[in-house]
Amino acid sequence: MSARPGLLARAEARLTREWQRRGALAWALAPFACAFGAIAALRRAAYARGWKARVDCGVPVVVVGNVTVGGTGKTPTVIALVDALRAAGFTPGVVSRGYGAKIAAPTAVTAASPPQQAGDEPLLIARRTLAPVWVCPDRVAAVRALKAAHPEVDVVVSDDGLQHYRLARAVEIVVFDHRLGGNGFLLPAGPLREPLSRRRDATLVNDPYSRALPPWPDTFALSLAPGDAWHLDRPSRRKPLAQFAGERVLAAAGIGAPERFFATLRAAGVAPATRALPDHYAFATNPFVDDHFDAILITEKDAVKLGTSWRDARIWVVPVEAALDPRLIALVVEKLRGRTSA
């Protein structure tokens, strides 16, 4: 197996660690962070003051995003929010950039779409929610295309896109993991795309260690719980995680925060060897072919990229369910029914 995935993952992990402290590297990059912050502030001000126009697509938009780099749990949050909005009487659709997708124009994503065209996260959302999902780097174009194809949709959830200021939105939800804002510096000295003080309607904190929530207004805990694993070759075959406890298990993840996946497995009683792959890892070849384990546990996001040509009977997929605080759902529904613009 090529060493490149391991090198990339280690480089990502090293940078992530540096972003959690104000060490020599962070201070060396601080001048660049100041320049980045000035440019970002100017962009925000241009839309806030009307120098540039926001586009109202004729349907309320709920943006689920983050102000930090890396995975925080946005995708399971989007899936849970779509289900909650549907239960509240809405007909939701979803738009996404489609990271890694080879598209230039708005494109519909279905459960049968190839991951190269759809992107891994939109494809997972389409399969889990069965809601209309459209992808495009231009989210305004994606919302317009979705609404034209599905006039029954009365709310659109944007998977990421917090910094896509051109798109008018009714609600903004910012998702953090346990690292919150790291060292508090903007890119490239820290993990922040925008200051922690950035205005939003609600904050979710995905902290597997269940520490106290930060004292921010309208802040809620985000709980992610694993379900029974399902077999990659035979999805109808299920296995509780506890049954892997006595086996030689490898846990592998090509997501933004792989350690969170590993911690989830440990909390369920599994003691796996671990392998962090680069985020959005393509799985062009089987990276496990030379590994000697009884079982290999991967995430749902990675599983959507493994086609029918994969024939590795050791691979099991671990789904994750997000539990949203009822108060958050009530806040979102109230804002949508009031059609308040953020």
Swiss-Prot record:
Entry's Gene Ontology cellular component terms: plasma membrane
Biological processes per GO annotation: lipid A biosynthetic process; lipopolysaccharide core region biosynthetic process
HAMAP family: LpxK (MF_00409)
UniProt source species: Burkholderia pseudomallei (strain K96243)
One Gene Ontology MF term: tetraacyldisaccharide 4'-kinase activity
InterPro entries the UniProt entry points to: LpxK (IPR003758), P-loop_NTPase (IPR027417)
UniProt pathway annotation: Glycolipid biosynthesis; lipid IV(A) biosynthesis; lipid IV(A) from (3R)-3-hydroxytetradecanoyl-[acyl-carrier-protein] and UDP-N-acetyl-alpha-D-glucosamine: step 6/6
Lineage: superkingdom: Bacteria
UniProt family annotation: Belongs to the LpxK family.
Catalytic activity from the UniProt record: a lipid A disaccharide + ATP = a lipid IVA + ADP + H(+)
Positions annotated to bind ATP: T68, V69, G70, G71, T72, G73, K74, T75
Keyword ATP-binding listed: yes
Protein name: Tetraacyldisaccharide 4'-kinase
EC number of this enzyme: 2.7.1.130
Alphabetized UniProt keyword annotations: ATP-binding, Kinase, Lipid A biosynthesis, Lipid biosynthesis, Lipid metabolism, Nucleotide-binding, Transferase
Pfam family, one: LpxK
Chain segments annotated as coiled-coil in the UniProt record: none
Known function: Transfers the gamma-phosphate of ATP to the 4'-position of a tetraacyldisaccharide 1-phosphate intermediate (termed DS-1-P) to form tetraacyldisaccharide 1,4'-bis-phosphate (lipid IVA).
Gene this protein is translated from: lpxK
